[in-house]
Amino acid sequence: MSDTPAIRLKRGEGHAFKAGGPWIYDNEIAEILGEPADGGIVRIEDYNGYPLGVGFLNRASTIAVRLLSRDAGAVIDRDFLERRVRAAWQYRKDTVDTSSCRVIFGESDFLPGLVVDKFADVLVVESLALGIDRLKSTILSLLVDLLKEDGIFVRGIYERSDAKVRLKEGMERVKGFLSDPFDPVVEIVENGVRYQVDVAEGQKTGFFLDQKYNRLAIQPLARGGRVLDCFTHTGAFALNAAKGGAAEVLGVDASELGVAQATQNAALNGMSDRVRFACRDVFELLPELERKGEKFDLVILDPPAFTKSRASVKKAVTGYREINLRGIKLVKNGGYLATCSCSHFMTPELFTKTIGEAARDARRRLRQVEYRTQSPDHPVLWGADQSLYLKFYIFQVVDDA
């Protein structure tokens, strides 16, 4: 153990890490002992040299060390990785429909910086940290073998490590096949709805699996009603509304590609007669609908992250307040609003406050139906605040009697 390179924390630093956090920042480190390579394994020590665990080192990143184990004597070998992968897959089998799901969710599965999504018989991988990038091939090989034990034969693997955050790790953005080439448009079924998922060109890994059960939750609220789905992407919420029995659904998105894919998905499900999509800027369309006196039984707001840093939170609050204000005004008395934020920096408390301000400005009352977060295959690891990012509310909009 003494031969392992180490980092030693400054006196008084590492509070978040000691409280369960998975990261150590560069400004918390007093010294580096030995000659570890970036992407290599280091022992983590407090100021007095007491061992706290082992993790990946990357001097090029603000996140200098990513935790692998709080056992400072852990050997990071194939057996270690197999235990991690097996535990992650078993957890999914315990908690979610695994036909399509997130199999590995980075720090929450103690494989920092790695995301693996399963779409039917295709795996999509996103590697966001230097250390895990070097173990990616081994982990994927282990996962393929593990799935085979359950009778699941992986047809292909596609890499979507094209996020800008890789540049902060000193890594290039990459995407492409990690297996023999295959048709990257994959059909999946979720909540009884069929989708064509483009794992090569779709947003992120191709489809937002984190909203799986939130989409299911709106189905009964849509029955027989008129539904507006804002920021529809490839139509998932809109199609779940139709699955729930909505009489009429309008899905809106500024992306022509997204609207085209949503339209195809509606046809795939035989819903084209009840679901239509429009390529429009939601911020422009909602005031237009209000001026026309349009009302809906259910309004769904699923915007992209308005902030990806603390510096832009104030601007994001303005955006969330505006979109919720406009959305609330379009809900019939007694109708429902489903609204969410996928930004970690928009805390639950701040998001709740912002919705409340929007309701006040709209002069409407909100009755909370339920509060939800991301689906269980995106587990929230307590102590790792960044693992909680999706906030999802359903409200009934009621006027004073």
Regions found by a protein language model. Give the residues of each.
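Conserved class I S-adenosyl-L-methionine
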Residues: 224-233
